[in-house]
Amino acid sequence: FCNDELYQIRKHRLFKYFGFWSEFHAKTIDIPCAYFIQDLLNNVPESQRFLSFKSDIRVKKYKRYNQELLESNQTHIRDLMYYLGELHNCNTYDKENNYPIPQEIKNIYGAEQIDELNNILSICSTFEEFLQHNQILYDYFEKISS
């Protein structure tokens, strides 16, 4: 997954217009690649790669992002997308644990709004899927901003 193809996506002529997509996917591209490269440089055996990544998720990232959202009173839709990207990342690379959206956060930002956004982003998990389904996402933004 950490190869030239992902970096070519960022150079795609349409990419600059999809800032919301990039907020969600920054985690799923940049962070795992950074850990992967770090493991390669440190000659970590393949069977042990991502162990430090999983450890960081459990100890830091999930709790930190939950806390930041709970403490924020000026959260924008981009922040929610970045947060959902973080959860998506946690659940992709650490299948032994389930990282749910806490009810407390759903209560603050609206369970229906967060669930709907999460469902939309789930069907837009690649750039190609996003291009196919971007109207659903734009309709969602229009709905919540009106």
Question: How should these model regions be labeled?
Answer:
Residues S47-S146:
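Pan-zinc metallopeptidase signature
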Residues C2-D79:
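Metalloprotease/metallohydrolase-associated module, dominated by Zn2+-dependent proteases
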